[in-house]
């Protein structure tokens, strides 16, 4: 598909979304309004087919329109053709090698939510906010997120070619990453003076038990305070984030989910699952997502912990694959996770009560760092000095 035709598809799909969502303003009482908008959609489709300067690929137009609708509503949604959906189901249960990227759709293209610590992608220099213009020379502009994830998988030792855009770059940088088996980092614990430091870089099943074991070990070593480092905690089931919060929180609401057709479901802390009452500081960054930010939101809202760092990524939703008549499928967010005080974590993230810039200023008078949470980071993001200052601030933060 040439660039001019891509533009037509994108513009067309955006117009369709506007018509379907907002075309009924002023006549919303009419039950026929949505069908009127579909009539306009059909008319636009016929005009493209009849009048466009070149003979259009109508299948591409339709797929582009569907992707445009989904992206406008939910950047994490995907439309998969029947063949793509079969591949998706097969890939879900496979143990193929990977490059270790967590992806999301931002700015119309795929972007990096996180590079799993120790993965080939992290070693290749990927960081949160990198915009991926292409994967294996295929543009990600109209690529469903679920399909992009499939392209990352393959046989160990084979390469994936990326076109990556960063701040101050006018052309995509070509990066080749070799697939390997992904080993998710184990939970680690250490003493720093009288403070126990626990690092969690992912919440794969079993990690919460590891955290509980580290808490017990650190308390035996005389810990009077705990620091829970959730930077780059972006993988694993969301439910693990709820279980993680419950280790520190013995009462009250942890989170709840709610969707248009999903009834509100509350998750309360259970006293029997809490394992410590020590003062707590949690560190987060832009790569903290899913269960990590669910736990962070709960511990901050309940005043169980202070939160230090950057605003988290903002990806905490329940997604469901809906199969269509022709065997294709739509993957949609059907419910969002909310903080106990009612703030949606999805797209908003969790804002610390001590931001990174404050931590750096506390470490060195006159240090200047605007560090806007939603700016696209450049190659200097997440370098060791900034990370060290966050840890120093967490270690010295007075109890509330």
Positions of predicted regions on the chain:
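PDZ/PDZ-like peptide-tail recognition elements
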Residues: 64, 75-114
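Stable alpha-helical structural segments in soluble proteins, enriched in small hydrophobic residues
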Residues: 64-68, 124, 390-394, 398
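Short acidic, Pro/Gly- and aromatic-enriched capping/linker segments at domain boundaries
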Residues: 324-336
């Amino acid at each position: 598909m040439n660039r001019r035709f891509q533009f037509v598809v994108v513009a067309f799909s955006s117009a369709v979304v506007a018509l379907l969502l907002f075309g009924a303003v002023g006549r919303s009482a009419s039950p026929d309004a949505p069908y009127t908008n579909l009539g306009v959609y059909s008319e636009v489709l016929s005009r493209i087919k009849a009048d466009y300067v070149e003979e259009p690929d109508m299948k591409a137009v339709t797929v582009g329109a569907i992707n445009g609708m989904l992206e406008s509503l939910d950047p994490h949604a995907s439309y998969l053709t029947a063949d793509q959906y079969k591949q998706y189901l097969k890939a879900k249960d496979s143990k193929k090698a990977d490059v270790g990227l967590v992806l999301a759709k931002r700015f119309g293209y795929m972007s990096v939510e996180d590079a799993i610590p120790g993965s080939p992608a992290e070693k290749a220099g990927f960081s949160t906010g990198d915009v991926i213009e292409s994967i294996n020379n295929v543009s990600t502009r109209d690529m469903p997120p679920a399909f992009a994830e499939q392209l990352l998988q393959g046989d160990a030792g084979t390469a994936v070619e990326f076109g990556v855009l960063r701040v101050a770059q006018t052309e995509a940088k070509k990066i080749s990453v070799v697939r390997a088996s992904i080993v998710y980092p184990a939970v680690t614990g250490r003493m720093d003076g009288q403070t126990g430091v626990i690092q969690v870089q992912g919440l794969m099943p079993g990690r919460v038990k590891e955290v509980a074991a580290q808490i017990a070990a650190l308390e035996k070593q005389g810990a009077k305070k705990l620091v829970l480092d959730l930077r780059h905690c972006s993988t694993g089931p969301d439910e693990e984030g709820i279980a993680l919060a419950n280790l520190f929180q013995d009462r009250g609401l942890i989170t709840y989910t709610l969707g248009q057709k999903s009834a509100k479901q509350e998750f309360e802390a259970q006293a029997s699952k809490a394992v410590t009452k020590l003062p707590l500081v949690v560190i987060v960054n832009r790569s903290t997502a899913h269960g990590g930010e669910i736990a962070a939101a709960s511990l901050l809202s309940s005043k169980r912990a202070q939160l230090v760092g950057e605003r988290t990524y903002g990806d905490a939703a329940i997604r469901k694959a809906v199969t269509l008549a022709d065997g294709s499928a739509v993957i949609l967010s059907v419910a969002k996770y909310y903080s106990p005080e009612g703030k949606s974590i999805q797209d908003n993230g969790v804002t610390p009560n001590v931001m990174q810039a404050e931590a750096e200023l506390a470490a060195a008078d006159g240090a200047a760092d605007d560090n806007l949470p939603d700016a696209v980071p450049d190659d200097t993001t997440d370098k060791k000095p900034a990370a060290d200052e966050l840890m120093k601030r967490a270690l010295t933060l007075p109890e509330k």
